[in-house]
């Protein structure tokens, strides 16, 4: 068994090392007593590979490795560098060749790390002081046409985090996320999080979540919440806005939610005693300036 295992391991390494696009390969097999052997394969492509080279390795090489090992499944990671962007593709995944091809098309210089995984494609951007224009991926992007994988974007803007979670068929580009970030008062930006979700897990609504930190509940005021809410009043895409306030010593944040329809807030918020003053402040002419 050990000799046969070593022979298969050597064949896999020889095959991968012989591919033109491959810079290096590492193959490991972990014997299991009562389960099939576990195979892990790390493949590093040559820098700046073409889309065709990436697709060939992700699709054809994985199938060949399965055949050579005789295993039902192999955990394989294909990595490469495009410009200054590091890309990691974790196999197996559904429609791996399509996911890899679409990801290569979506790469841009501002991206630092990209991961293609079983359920999602995540784009992590380099820290900057201002959110780039046209940051939100448009529906025309190839990765958003896949449908089988979630697509997420994340970036650190100064001291605030911004996350975008997409869904097939949902266009988020009209949501003024950049303006919302810029309206957060400077004393509330440290650790603040602004998340835009095309579909939340429960109600499948387009939702904006703003989370800020305060030292004590006594420091809570409506200014930051009202500023963020004001930027999205009138937006036709958002169906809900949630404003969260956390105190470092407390586990559960306080949440004020607003349902929206056709750009207008429905009711006074939930709970209304917290939502009403925020909404009133957000509706002032200079609320988002």
What are these regions (language model features)?
Residues 15, 54-65, 103-105, 134-146, ...:
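Short amphipathic alpha-helices in soluble, non-transmembrane regions
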Residues 41-54, 127-131, 206-221:
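A short interface-forming secondary-structure element
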Residues 1-53, 96-106, 176-188, 279-289:
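Extracytoplasmic low-complexity, Pro/Thr/Ser/Ala/Gly-rich segments
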Residues 30-38, 73-88, 159, 245-252:
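Acidic helix-start/capping segments at beta-turn-to-alpha-helix junctions
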Residues 170-255:
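Intrinsically disordered, low-complexity segments enriched in Gly and acidic/Ser/Thr residues
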Residues 79-196:
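Surface-exposed beta-loop interaction hotspot
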Residues 19-43, 111-122, 187-211:
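Short edge beta-strands and adjacent turn/loop segments
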Residues 237-289:
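Hydrophilic extracytoplasmic domains
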């Amino acid at each position: 068994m050990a000799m046969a295992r070593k022979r298969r391991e050597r064949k896999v390494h020889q095959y991968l090392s012989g591919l033109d696009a491959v810079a290096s390969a590492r193959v490991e097999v972990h014997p299991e007593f009562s389960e099939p052997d576990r195979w892990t394969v790390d493949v590093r492509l040559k820098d700046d590979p073409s889309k065709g080279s990436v697709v060939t390795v992700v699709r054809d090489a994985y199938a060949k490795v399965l055949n050579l090992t005789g295993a039902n499944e192999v955990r394989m990671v294909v990595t490469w560098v495009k410009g200054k962007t590091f890309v990691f593709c974790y196999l197996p995944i559904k429609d791996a060749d399509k996911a890899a091809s679409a990801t290569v098309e979506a790469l841009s210089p501002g991206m630092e790390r990209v991961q293609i995984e079983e359920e999602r494609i995540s784009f992590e951007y380099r820290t900057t002081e201002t959110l780039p224009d046209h940051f939100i991926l448009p529906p025309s992007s190839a990765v958003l046409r896949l449908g089988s994988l979630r697509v997420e974007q994340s970036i650190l803007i100064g001291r605030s985090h911004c996350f975008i979670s997409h869904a097939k068929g949902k266009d988020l580009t009209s949501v003024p996320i950049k303006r919302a970030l810029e309206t957060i008062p400077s004393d509330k930006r440290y650790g603040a999080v602004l998340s835009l979700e095309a579909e939340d897990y429960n109600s499948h609504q387009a939702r904006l979540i703003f989370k800020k930190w305060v030292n004590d509940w006594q420091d809570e005021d409506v200014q930051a919440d009202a500023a963020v809410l004001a930027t999205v009043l009138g937006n036709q895409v958002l169906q809900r806005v949630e404003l969260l306030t956390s105190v470092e010593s407390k586990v559960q944040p306080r949440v004020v939610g607003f349902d929206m329809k056709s750009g207008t807030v429905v009711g006074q918020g939930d709970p209304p005693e917290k939502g009403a003053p925020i909404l009133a402040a957000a509706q002032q002419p200079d609320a988002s300036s």
